Curated annotation (Swiss-Prot):
The keyword Cytoplasm applies. One of its GO terms (biological process) is negative regulation of G1/S transition of mitotic cell cycle. Residues 181-274 form the Fibronectin type-III domain. Its main location: cytoplasm. Expressed in several embryonic and adult tissues, including adult and fetal brain, liver, spleen and pancreas. Expressed in adult, but not fetal kidney. Expressed in skin and squamous cell carcinoma (SCC) and in several other cancer types. Also detected in lesion actinic keratosis (AK). Belongs to the cytokine receptor-like factor 3 family. The gene is CRLF3. This is Cytokine receptor-like factor 3.
């Protein structure tokens, strides 16, 4: 009885500790949720503020542009009025000058005639004779024609008031406010030297024609375009390991020119070591990141291997052929358990590969199944999974079995690859006998 009573406080103490730990854990979780709420509130507040600024700026720009366009149109119309006025007034001015000249001539003639007549007949006959002679040379019955009012311009402005209704309708329909963008980033998948970005449409009423993906380092202020097209997935290459990047996507509606608002930016990074070719091999020139190999015109031959065994089972290894040269049946692109110098091709033991003609080799033996020939732009992928980790039967002739899937040009072959011993990671390599072949690995 006493032992039970002594034990009871210990149990109570233990239970109290557990309750305290549970309460601490609960408090931490609630703290995380509070932080999540703060982030959500911040996103709403900041996006609302940004949207207000965008709307104000846009409509101010619109008002300025419309005012400028209206002013320019007014100036054009006023210039047309000036031109018509000047062109049609000139004939009237000429006619007025002619009439005024006739009036002056007639007034002079009247004065001369009256003076001549004051002298009467006799000694003033000479003046009368001179006046009569002068008057006979002036066509007093010839009057210039003055145009009727119906025959001269009467300027007016034709202004269609319906434009106000048209503009009003467009203005009332101009712009929308959306509570969320029509597309969002769905998933970020790390790859060696890259990140696969997948996005999806979240607005069922929005019909997307194209998507636009941008990214930047989190330390940068500038996003840059990395993909524009109709696909909903893209691998962003040249990603530095263990560096945070920000991604965002938008869409363009069917038949529209403008892009939708950007999705909520997502942060991702890759912890995987980038795939690199071995530098310094005489027959190949490498890019600055050493993920692109170009077969140069050096006479040196052999297999160009990866710098390290960076391919692990369960991953997808991708080779993209950027340019092609003259094919040779000994060409090879593939993976191997270890580097072996002295070989001109991966068509050897402890390696699997595809030749540029599409032939598949496993441990140096050509398979019956064949893939399409490799061309410029072709993508060849290797997916390898461990099948057995223990010793297999002697009939299989190996100790470690891997299941390999090689895909190229929408075709694939699947087979088991037997190795002498287990290996946690694999090398990759390529060999080309003629220059011009360029291969990107990721």
């Amino acid at each position: 009885m006493r032992g039970a009573m002594e034990l009871e406080p210990e149990l109570l103490l233990q239970e109290a500790r557990e309750n305290v730990e549970a309460a601490q854990s609960y408090r931490r979780e609630l703290g995380h949720r509070l932080e999540g709420l703060r982030e959500a509130r911040r996103q709403i507040k900041e996006s609302a503020s940004q949207t207000r600024d965008v709307l104000k700026q846009h409509f101010n720009d619109l008002k300025g542009t419309l005012g400028k366009l209206l002013d320019e149109r007014l100036v054009t119309l006023l210039q047309e009025v000036d031109t018509i006025e000047q062109e049609t007034i000139k004939p009237l001015d000429d006619c007025q000058k002619l009439i005024e000249h006739g009036v002056n001539t007639a007034e002079d003639l009247v004065r001369e005639g009256e003076i001549a007549m004051l002298g009467g007949v006799g000694e003033e006959n000479e003046k009368l004779w001179s006046f009569t002679k002068k008057a006979s040379h002036i066509q007093l019955d010839s009057l210039p024609e003055v145009p009727l009012l119906v025959d001269v311009p009467c300027l007016s402005a034709q202004l269609d008031d319906s434009i106000l209704n048209i503009v009003k309708d467009h203005i009332f329909k101009h712009g929308t406010v959306a509570s969320r963008p029509p597309v969002q980033i769905e998933e970020l998948i790390e790859k060696p030297g890259g990140i696969i970005v997948r996005w999806c449409k979240v607005d069922d009423d929005f019909t997307a024609q194209d998507y636009r993906l941008q990214f930047r380092k989190c330390t940068s202020n500038h996003f840059e375009d990395v993909y524009v097209g109709s696909e909903t997935e893209f691998i962003v290459l040249h990603i530095d390991p263990n560096v945070d990047y920000q991604f965002r996507v938008c869409a363009r509606g069917d038949g529209r020119q403008e892009w939708s608002p950007w999705s909520v930016p997502q942060i991702g990074h890759s912890t995987l070591v980038p795939h690199e070719w071995t530098a310094g091999f005489e027959g190949y020139s490498l890019s600055s990141r050493r993920n692109i190999a170009l077969r140069n015109d050096s006479e040196s031959s052999g297999v160009l291997y990866s710098r390290a065994p960076t391919y692990f089972c369960g991953q997808t290894l991708t080779f993209r052929v950027e340019t092609v040269g003259q094919p040779d049946r000994r060409d090879s692109i593939g993976v191997c358990a270890e580097k072996q110098d002295g070989y001109d091709s991966l068509q050897r033991d402890q390696a699997v590969c595809i030749s540029t003609n599409g032939a598949v080799f496993v441990n140096g033996k050509e398979m019956t199944n064949q893939l399409p020939a490799v061309t410029s732009g072709s993508t060849v992928t290797f997916d390898i999974e461990a099948v057995t980790l223990g010793t297999t039967s002697n009939n299989e002739g190996g100790h470690f079995k891997l299941r390999v899937t090689i895909s190229s040009n929408n075709r694939e072959v699947v087979f088991d690859w037997l190795l002498d011993q287990s290996c946690g990671s694999l090398y990759f390599g390529c060999s080309f006998f003629y220059p011009g072949w360029k291969v990107l690995v990721f």
